[in-house]
Amino acid sequence: MMKFLILNGPNINILGIREPDIYGRQSYDDLLRLVSGHAEELGVGVEFYQSNHEGDLVDAIQKAYFDGIDGIVFNPAAYTHTSVAIADAVKGVGIPTVEVHISEVSKREAFRQVSYIGAVAVHTVTGRGLAGYNEAMDYLAKLLGERK
């Protein structure tokens, strides 16, 4: 069975509280339920990890390699625009990674137009709300199925 890491960066743990006009009213627990249900439908296993700390996210990406994770669905949140270290980790381990953003970052502030993660990801999904995570899993399942 394929296994995906669902990795979330800073402030994703306060979904539903943080700027609901941008990110919606669904909570982080709602996200976990949504993704778990879709993973079951796809027949893939999922592990979840969220951190507000850059180094923890790097560690989680490296751990995914050693744990044999097949793909990563990653919402790096604000680190999208700032973290060369996280981008280097994604590139370094070579696990197919789909970058996900709940909001449509291309229609937001100028500083959000740069994505270090997008440069090393196999695909990016933005502006689809929480459903973007399921889209990312679909993409990975198809990509990895074609590679076998």
Description of each model-found segment:
Residues 1-5:
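Extreme N-terminal starter segment of soluble prokaryotic enzymes
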Residues 6-12:
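N-terminal nucleotide-binding beta1-loop-alpha1 segment
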Residues 15-29:
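Glycine- and acidic-residue-enriched helix-capping/strand-helix junction motifs
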Residues 47-55:
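Short beta->alpha junction loops
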Residues 56-72:
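Short, electropositive alpha-helical surface patch
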Residues 68-106:
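Mid-chain, well-packed structural core segment of small domains
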Residues 111-130:
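Short beta-strand elements at the ligand-binding edges of bilobed clamshell
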Residues 126-148:
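A charged, well-structured terminal subsegment
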